[in-house]
Amino acid sequence: MYIPMVVEQSGRGERAYDIYSRLLKERIIFLGGGIDDQVANLIIAQLLFLEAEDPDKDIHLYINSPGGVVTSGMAIYDTMRYIKAPVSTICVGQAASMGAVLLAAGEKGKRFSLNHSRIMIHQPLGGFQGQATDISIHAKEILRMKEELNSILADLTGQSKERIEADTDRDYFMSATEAEEYGLIDATFTRKPDSGGTP
């Protein structure tokens, strides 16, 4: 994938940044694509760096993700909760599966979506093969993760755990407006606010 470069002029001359490094200077992190350990480690490193720079200033996490590995997503989730700096989340395109959990995990009042984004929640996926005892162990772990994610979504959205369990039994797609009504986000935007707004 080609990554654009941005050239900045200063009194010292020119300096070239890749686009993601330039966004990081503005405290913007972009999560685009599937979530795995490598992606999670990059996102976590950026969160920790920005918190070390200024623990009181908002970090803006833009999300366009179909989800991915639950444990990788939970590592990002836990780091968002761990750091002192508030993390604002903005969905652009889609936030599905773990992407939706991370979207909802933003600072309350600072969870946003652009108007035509799609948000989807569901139960964790798993496929295992091997000895029967190993399959049984993995099945128990998937059920434990499902229970944990349902509790997290109930806490983040204000929905009852029973409703979350029913809705995540199958893929549950929402528009940005529906996600706002559900409690996954706090507002939808078609344009960037003129002043003081996060996105």
UniProtKB/Swiss-Prot annotation:
GO cellular component, one term: endopeptidase Clp complex
Top EC class of this enzyme: hydrolase
An example molecular function term from Gene Ontology annotations: serine-type endopeptidase activity
GO biological process, one term: protein quality control for misfolded or incompletely synthesized proteins
Keyword Metal-binding: no
Its EC number(s): 3.4.21.92
Keyword Transcription on entry: no
Places the protein is found: Cytoplasm
Gene3D superfamilies: 2-enoyl-CoA Hydratase, Chain A, domain 1 (3.90.226.10)
Catalytic machinery residues: 97, 122
Domain of life, per lineage: Bacteria
Catalytic activity: Hydrolysis of proteins to small peptides in the presence of ATP and magnesium. alpha-casein is the usual test substrate. In the absence of ATP, only oligopeptides shorter than five residues are hydrolyzed (such as succinyl-Leu-Tyr-|-NHMec, and Leu-Tyr-Leu-|-Tyr-Trp, in which cleavage of the -Tyr-|-Leu- and -Tyr-|-Trp bonds also occurs)
UniProt keyword terms in alphabetical order: Cytoplasm, Hydrolase, Protease, Serine protease
Major location (coarse): cytoplasm
HAMAP family referenced in this protein's UniProt entry, alphabetically: ClpP
PANTHER family found in the cross-reference section: ATP-DEPENDENT CLP PROTEASE PROTEOLYTIC SUBUNIT
Subunit organization: Fourteen ClpP subunits assemble into 2 heptameric rings which stack back to back to give a disk-like structure with a central cavity, resembling the structure of eukaryotic proteasomes.
Function of the protein: Cleaves peptides in various proteins in a process that requires ATP hydrolysis. Has a chymotrypsin-like activity. Plays a major role in the degradation of misfolded proteins.
Family: Belongs to the peptidase S14 family.
Protein name: ATP-dependent Clp protease proteolytic subunit
Biological source species: Pelobacter propionicus (strain DSM 2379 / NBRC 103807 / OttBd1)
